[in-house]
A protein has these predicted regions:
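Short polar/acidic secondary-structure junctions
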Residues: 22, 35-36, 144, 158-160
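Short Pro/Gly-enriched beta-strand edge/turn motifs at strand-loop
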Residues: 7-16, 123-126, 148-151
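Active-site HxH/HxHxD metal-binding segment of metal-dependent hydrolases
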Residues: 48-144, 232-243
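Metallo-beta-lactamase
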Residues: 41, 48-51, 55, 118, ...
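Glycine-rich phosphate-binding loop signature in dinucleotide/nucleotide-binding domains
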Residues: 36, 68-73, 146-151, 170-171, ...
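Short Gly/Pro-enriched turn/cap motifs at secondary-structure boundaries
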Residues: 19-22, 133-136, 157-159
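Hydrophobic/aromatic beta-strand patches that form the interior of the parallel beta-sheet core
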Residues: 8-10, 79, 103, 137-139, ...
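Conserved beta-strand hairpin/beta-sheet module of binuclear metal-dependent hydrolase folds
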Residues: 2-68, 167-181
């Protein structure tokens, strides 16, 4: 789905309980088109390949991209906001189709390949497989060096939901790709390994200072998954401060 010029959103259905039961869990994926040299694209959080209810998430993503005239082999960079499988599992498959490098923060990669691997071994006993993280590039706080890129992106360290969670800010479009930092009326979970209530509050306050016209969240929690308009976004931050922060 095209939002504005060169910005596409692929929202995973799952607003109502019936939809969540039917479609299962997966993240929203976003694409910045024609943003790299030779007209290549950046995809943020490609999601899963197949989820817990056997929905073929990656196939669905590729079909929706094709409807917008976007070919998966024209992807030039894959960015993970964080290393939870519902956000990154499809990354290696897309890399195989496009030869695009995978980028994640170093803190997130190190956490998931140490503590995360211990957790993964425990989950494997229940038949749950957590793919390993293999990064080609590490994201650091500050402007992302994309060479001869058309889009200037800024990486923001936003820990709290996970230790190395990042958000991506596109100043030209005033768009924030927030991953699982903040949703419509809620925040990312902090009651999981690597989560921190203190850090997620600090991270939300950090991004709330930006000029944002498009808040692009990782899930449709609270609906909609995209909050548009500076005043609507400000109201959402205010709501989260008043009604969610005290209970984290």
């Amino acid at each position: 789905m095209k939002l504005v010029e060169n910005l596409y959103a692929y929202l995973w259905p799952g607003i109502t309980m019936a939809e969540m039961q039917r479609y299962g869990n997966n993240c929203n994926s976003y694409l910045i088109a024609n943003s790299l040299k030779e007209g290549k694209h950046i995809i943020i959080d490609p999601g899963q390949v197949v989820n817990e209810v056997e929905q073929r998430c990656l196939d669905r993503l590729i079909v929706e991209m094709n409807k917008d005239g976007i070919r998966v082999d024209d992807i030039g960079l894959i960015i993970y906001t964080h290393a939870h499988p519902d956000h990154y599992e499809a990354g290696p498959a897309i890399k195989g189709m496009s030869n695009a490098p995978i980028a994640i923060s170093k803190d997130e990669s190190e956490f998931m390949n140490t503590v995360g691997r211990q957790m993964a071994k425990q989950l494997e006993a229940f038949g749950i497989r957590i793919p390993e993280i293999a990064a080609d590039l590490y994201l650091e706080d500050g402007e992302l060096d994309l060479g001869e890129a058309k889009a200037i992106l800024r990486i923001l360290n936003t820990p709290g939901h996970s230790p190395g969670h990042v958000s991506i800010y596109w100043p030209d479009m005033k768009a924030l790709f927030g991953g699982d930092l903040v949703f419509n009326g809620s925040t990312g979970r902090v009651d999981i390994p690597g989560g921190s209530a203190r850090l997620i509050k600090e991270s939300i306050e950090k991004v709330s200072q930006l000029e944002i016209e498009y808040l692009l969240t990782g899930h449709q929690y609270g609906s909609p998954g995209i909050i548009q308009g500076r005043e609507n976004i400000k109201r959402n931050f205010d709501f989260v401060r008043r009604n969610v922060f005290p209970y984290l």
